[in-house]
Amino acid sequence: MTDFCIIGKPIAMIDAAEKTTGSGRYTDDLSLPGMLVGKILHSPYPHARIKNIDGSRAERLDGVVAVVVGKDAPNPYGILPVGHDEHALALDKVRYVGDNVACVVAVTEAIAEKALELIDVNYEILPAYFDPEESMKAQADLIHDNKPNNVEKDYHHVFGDPKKGFADADEIDERRFIANEVTHAAMEPHSTLASFEIDPQTGNAGRLTVWSSTQVPYYLQHKLSLVLEMPMSQIRVIKPLVGGGFGGKSEVIPLEIIAAIAARKAQAPVKITYTREEVFWAHRGRPRTIIDLKTGVKHDGRITAVKARVVQDGGAYCSYGVVTILYSGALLGALYDIPNIQFDGYRVLTNKPACGAMRGHGTVNVRFAFESQLDELAAKIGMDPAEIRRRNLLQPPCITVNGLRVQSYGLPECIEKTVERSGWKERKGKLAKGRGLGIACSHYVSGAANSIIRSDMPHSTVNVKIDRDGGVVIYTGASEIGQGSDTMTAQIAAEVLGCSLRRVKVIAADTDLTPIDIGSYSSRVTFMAGNATLRAAEEVKKLIAAAAAKKMGCEVDELVFRDDVVMRSSGVIAEGLSGQNRPGRDGRERPSPHGTFSPQQAQQASVSGHVEGQILRGSLQQKRKEEGPKDSMTFEEAVVAAIDFHGALTGTGSYAPPPEARGGKHKGAGVGPSPAYSYSAQVAEVSVDEDTGEVTVHKVWAAHDCGRALNPVSVEGQIIGSVWMGMGQALTEEMVWKDGLLMNPGMLEYRSPSAIESPEVEAIIVESVDPEGPFGAKECSEGSLAATIPAIANAIYDAVGVRLREAPFTPERVLTALRAKKNGKALNLTEGVDPTSPVRFREHGGALCYKGKGPERHALDRSRCGTSSVPGGAD
């Protein structure tokens, strides 16, 4: 069925009103009686051993209720089962400037901040490692004693025969690419409110409730249980409105556990909200990545082999690191047909904040390198960049060389649409000097086929309940974080049930009320929670259909649910009036199964609250019993009949990816497989000022294969948002470090593009209709981002003839490349570029809550190792 009532229609988000009017409540808006404020003391050193912590002076300050330190919750945790290397508050060591040392709980924020100054910490300063390739050489003073050479994890995969593939190649290109660290820059800072039920007789802490701006309520509940040594059933996690996540809230952040520990110790509700600067220090963004890439092609453009060595600067803790490094290798496949791949990946520890998941998790940096190199190879063999991509398309359904199953594949159409809309054939290489076009492609998963927590449980479960008045309530654990997942689930349920969207209410992400969903990340919600919603709605629809069929004296398969009416698909109402409305036996207009409601019908079939539906229901039902079976019923009437026959109207649906979508058996095979993949192609038009090095993006044509667009306006918004975020990483965004200090910990210095700098984006929806997606839908919110960066890089080459292999493409880097071209020498990636030199960076490293000033805050070299014993931790 493709004649949808709600699916495929542009629909406003169901939570739009509360967000646009300011009536919506985010975590930091919440307050409880007797609530206290928590503030965190951070490490001033990148690497040091904690010899002693004394919070007694802080505890004596009026207004201070508690001081919390690492020994108050010594159990380690981590988002991955293989990476339990974090403590909410440091126990024996601090591993980066900004690491969490202690927390003060006080009646006001001002008192808490004053108390931080009174905590005495003695440190033994240790050598620190800031560059991942240098860190890999470490033999002593390791960041974690159980990680030799500071390597968190390394993987080595060979698929096919890469040696033969390179031997067969007519042209080979081998380059180093660097993509620097970036962060999410979500509007809402991380915030958590924790409250224990305190037994008034014993004073013991009982049940815990946590409100948090999280993408993963179930994982948060799980980790709180682990650290606090409490049963999960005694922990309730509620997700209020979330002001953006992009991956930055997709794991358990120390703040969330610290708030719970503090609430238990203070025996009162405690709220902790990061300052914007703290968000930057705790960001878990995209890691700096060094990619040594080698690709071989034939003269006909066919790729023969790819070899990638990827080194990621993971920071001080595991975070999502194992998954991140595996994605960077696994998703080299599933975009093009590559017969031979060698991948060597290293996730390396450094004395900087941990990096984690960010929009396009694991794929963006390697895709920048690959799509840039593919253009270089096209130039070597004299082939159009669009054509070389066409020559390497997959032939679905297929299994890639590394075991990824591909069923729906809209990349060919994406390429054709962008080439056509941009005038590629007519304009490429023919624009005015300093202006150019570039093309690139990308793809992404529609959720991971294998769960982080290894189990056989469904990845998503949804419950649907229908009340007597026809109101539909959806209970889902999926987190709405601004991407529109609540609207999506409401649309699917309304489409299946044939009811109006205004009947549907969504209750989401409350672990006491909603069934398990493993979270909003990896673009999994539409595919997985959407399928679960569809199945739950179909289950309850069967109950309604059985009752309606009995009332109408027909078979269940004769019924059609549409426009708030349950009707027979054949019979009196279809005779001679197809496509028209006609009177029923009671004199009212009835819709044809092929028609729509008139305004009069819409009023008659409206939701509860109308006099006829509420006050006169009994007499109307009695009248209809006397008249005999009808050809149609309002949705509300059918629901009442079903409740009379069956009792409560509830349905449950679950989804887990099928076994055939879960990948191969090699080490690390669990990361990369997905039930479906999205595909994108982009053409960017840019201009380059050769005097200043400034790059301006004028327009981006972005085509995205999303399976089926359940809500086109939402899909277009996601495509535009992905392009915008990709442009930021391409041109301006970069976490700048100097000896372990973050030089730009604020929105002004970090420089995300503003609305003024955002280019025109022509979003092009391509619908391949996936056989397993809900109504054919799949991912739409992340896959486009990875194509933007190389499309801009390739456009810069078309404009001024220089290849930029380090992102972002700042004016300094552009000018350095132009000088290298003018002087006829190869570009050194770091020559002439000091990322800390622009005046926008804070030489003092910001105003994070830690002790010590200037260069004495931490060891800048090994010769300055020693012991700090002054209150607050500075010599």
What do these predicted ranges mean?
Residues 200-205, 567-629, 662, 827-875:
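Intrinsic disorder/low-complexity segments
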Residues 141-228, 392-471, 743-757, 762-764:
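Helix-loop-helix junctions that connect adjacent transmembrane helices in secondary transporters/permeases
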Residues 14-18, 117-130, 215-217, 222, ...:
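Extended active-site and interfacial segments that coordinate phosphate-rich ligands
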Residues 9, 15-18, 149-192, 288-372, ...:
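Glycine-rich loop/linker segments at domain edges
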Residues 1-151, 172, 255:
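Flexible, low-hydrophobicity surface segments
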Residues 232, 245-267, 271-273, 485-492:
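Thiamine diphosphate
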Residues 448, 453-514:
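Catalytic phosphate/nucleotide-handling subdomain of diverse soluble enzymes
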Residues 70-71, 229-234, 263-270, 299, ...:
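C-terminal catalytic domains of large/alpha subunits in multi-subunit enzymes
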